[in-house]
């Protein structure tokens, strides 16, 4: 009855997607990015690096599969956004999007190899330093609080913006953090927070963005290990990412995705696509 009412009301309905979804075989890359060795990363590049490791402090195992899950699902988004195809459209809104320069800058460095904890942190430190040294931005798929400290150490004197997650450092700028019993809940007035961010930001320092899926309201965080009451809606997160995108960002770490959590497959794919589109 509700569907019939919507149709009769004259609202514009989203057209059904008739194009076949791609079936990829072999090596997957994020957004169909070109594979590249780290020594060939150039200034202005967005260098994707996977961190397929479990966060032992997280409530559930499965985060190690997040980089692969994002690469697999981002193929669908990249298939529509890649300028080599004739129909670059947003997969949900069906609106034209501009991808000029994206695929020239986007490159996939693969994953950091499994090993001892010391070796993993050393490899992440070296990679982050090298990417930052040439003036590129590191997009880290996966991570943890401890791995984020390694990134901060690599970006000496950096400022950190944290979307979601549990506050760790009062000097960081927190957007919709998870309540931990002692932290003050951030003002929900987005305009006031944006003004506060402008005052907090020091352009002379590197900027590190920690993007945890717990930033989203519960209805959008089905795959997050730490579901929450409240949180931001999609428009608010998009607004924040657009604001951050106006600054020179040295590294972005995406955490909180656990593709093994039970739930409907369509919800899982939808959330991965949403995160891919936002990034």
Q: Locations of the language-model features?
A:
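Short, hydrophobic/glycine-enriched beta-strand segments
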Residues: 45-51, 161-162
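Gly/Ser/Thr-rich helix-start
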Residues: 51, 143-144
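Glycine-rich phosphate/pyrophosphate-binding beta-alpha loops
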Residues: 57
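Generic enzyme active-site microenvironment
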Residues: 143, 162-164, 210-212
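Mid-sequence, gly/pro-rich, charge-dense loop/helix-turn segments that line enzyme active sites
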Residues: 160-185
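Catalytic cores of soluble, metal-dependent hydrolases
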Residues: 4-47, 60-61, 65-138, 146-154, ...
